[in-house]
């Protein structure tokens, strides 16, 4: 699973996900891409599950790119713990994804396999997604 090697701060504030993506809205590497239609926080486990589903469908042919990185530590307190006593420990890492952001890209496979792989990957994510083609 993806996680940052080094962090400036151990814990982060909750923050908000931007409504529309300012960068990362165009396909940069591959021929096909998976674009988000909602804004959301995606965990490193969800990214890994989507990657595995897509790569398995591609039968390890072609190339697969992940365009998002879970760099935000999300902390959580244990259940049935009273208020106070500081912020909880880091539970997982997440990536903030805005509307219009390209999440994954792939290349080197036929269009039918690419669409099927990206549909499987999109099913593993908590956002609505759309498959886009380069120059479309």
UniProtKB/Swiss-Prot annotation:
Keyword entries, A-Z: Ribonucleoprotein, Ribosomal protein, RNA-binding, rRNA-binding, tRNA-binding
Q: Name one GO molecular function term.
A: structural constituent of ribosome
The protein's matches in Gene3D superfamilies, at most eight in alphabetical order, are given as: Ribosomal protein L10e/L16 (3.90.1170.10)
GO CC, sorted alphabetically, is:
cytosolic large ribosomal subunit
Which top-rank group of organisms is this from?
A: Bacteria
The protein's matches in Pfam families, at most eight in alphabetical order, are given as:
Ribosomal_L16
Record bears the keyword rRNA-binding: yes
The alphabetized list of GO BP terms reads: translation
Quaternary data = Part of the 50S ribosomal subunit.
Q: What does this protein do?
A: Binds 23S rRNA and is also seen to make contacts with the A and possibly P site tRNAs.
- Would you identify the family this protein belongs to, as annotated? Belongs to the universal ribosomal protein uL16 family.
Name of the protein described by the UniProt record: Large ribosomal subunit protein uL16
């Amino acid at each position: 699973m993806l996680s940052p090697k080094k962090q400036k701060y151990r814990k982060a504030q909750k923050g908000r996900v931007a409504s529309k993506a300012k960068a990362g809205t165009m396909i940069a590497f591959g021929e096909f891409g998976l674009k988000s239609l909602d804004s959301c926080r995606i965990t490193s486990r969800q990214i890994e599950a989507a990657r595995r589903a897509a790569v398995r469908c591609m039968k390890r042919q072609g190339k697969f790119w992940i365009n998002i990185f879970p760099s935000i530590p999300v902390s959580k307190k244990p259940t049935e713990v009273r208020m106070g006593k500081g912020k909880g420990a880091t539970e997982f890492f997440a990536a903030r994804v805005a509307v219009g952001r390209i999440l994954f890209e792939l290349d080197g496979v036929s269009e039918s396999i690419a669409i099927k792989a990206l549909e499987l990957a999109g099913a593993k994510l908590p956002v609505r997604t759309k498959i886009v083609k380069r120059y479309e």
